[in-house]
Design a protein with these regions (language model features):
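Hydrophobic alpha-helical targeting segments used for export or membrane insertion
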Residues: 1-11
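Short helix/strand-capping hinge loops at secondary-structure junctions
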Residues: 110-112, 117-118
Length: 325
């Protein structure tokens, strides 16, 4: 098939939000790189906004706009204009406060959408998006790319047998203007792989905080335990997994290691989702990750007192917690 025919056959993908480097990286993978697992997708249009008032995001928009234009992306003036030009959407806006209204427009249009992290700036809006997704029968998913770290995926697939526990050391800088809940801005990169490794079913959470780090201890409904050490002044991704069955003297499994793959594992999952309509992670699981983060924040504010997932959801909505599962 010649290049012109390939362009005609490609799924047209659009970006909402050019305030994150993800937008540029995803465009490069789809439009420039020759990754066979992403073949059949092309980024064709972008709506730049995006945060309106988070400086660390807004100051990127002019530069990233020019970069995606050089890769063949048309810049449009509204979300509605974007939706009219594409088959699928990557909602990349770095500001989770904007996601509720932006996602609803895509849901209404019936277009499949990947909502990049964070799904929302707090659990309240995450629950609203979850409800809207159900109401519209929307095809969507949201995740941190660290869910697709090879070892995390191997653990989730059962390659190491039943997982007894895991402990992760992760960076968790804050959004300096205070627009997001404590962990939704960046700390999600720790919570997401921990749930990937351990599976769903977090029951209760304790969190202890000082000026530079938080230690989150979580207990699953079956009694297993996982831990996060979230650092605000130490930029490292590390951790280990403890399988239930391990030979005596054998070291724990290291979760993260250097990889040249970058965002490709995530974009491959997005491509598969756009082609099949089957999300690699369910909205229910994403919601549990958000409730996990909210419970940790509530616990930290109470000096480490345990908080249940059900309590975190109840504090963010008038609906009963079980309505969301």
């Amino acid at each position: 098939m010649n290049t012109f025919a390939l362009l005609l056959a490609a799924l047209r993908v659009g970006i909402i939000g050019l305030d994150t480097s993800h937008a540029v990286s995803f465009t490069r993978i789809m439009n420039v790189d020759k990754d066979p697992e992403v073949e059949g997708l092309r980024m064709v249009a972008a709506y730049p906004w995006g945060s309106r008032d988070i400086f660390s995001s807004t100051n990127r928009i002019p530069k990233y706009t020019e970069e995606v234009k050089k890769m063949g992306v048309e810049i449009v003036s509204s979300v509605d204009d974007l939706i009219a030009k594409v088959d699928c959407v990557c909602l990349e806006t770095n500001d989770g406060r904007e996601h509720l209204w932006q996602a609803e427009k895509v849901f209404k249009a019936g277009k499949p959408v990947f909502i990049d992290k964070p799904l929302a700036h707090n659990l309240h809006d995450a629950l609203k998006i979850h409800e809207l997704g159900r109401a519209y029968g929307a095809k969507y998913f949201s995740t941190s790319g660290l869910r697709f770290a090879p070892v995390a995926q191997a653990a989730r697939s059962g390659d190491y047998g039943r997982i007894r526990g895991a402990a992760l050391l992760m960076p968790a800088p804050l959004e300096e203007q205070g627009t997001h809940n404590f962990y939704t801005w960046y700390g999600i990169h720790g919570f997401e792989p921990l749930v990937t490794i351990m599976g769903t079913g977090v029951d209760r959470v304790s969190c202890f905080r000082n000026g530079t780090e938080d230690v989150v201890n979580a207990v699953w409904s079956d009694g297993r335990m996982g831990e996060l050490r979230l650092m605000r002044d130490y930029w490292v991704y590390s951790g280990y997994i403890l399988p239930e069955k391990r030979a005596e003297g054998e070291s724990p499994i290291v979760v993260f290691s250097k990889s040249a793959e970058g965002y490709k594992p995530l974009v491959r999952q997005i491509a598969r989702f756009f082609k099949t309509g089957v999300p690699p992670v369910s909205p229910d699981e994403t919601l549990e990750v958000f409730a996990f983060m909210e419970a940790a924040e509530m616990s930290a504010k109470r000096g480490g007192e345990p908080v249940t997932i059900a309590e975190a959801i109840a504090a963010s909505t008038d609906a009963p917690w079980w309505k969301f599962w």
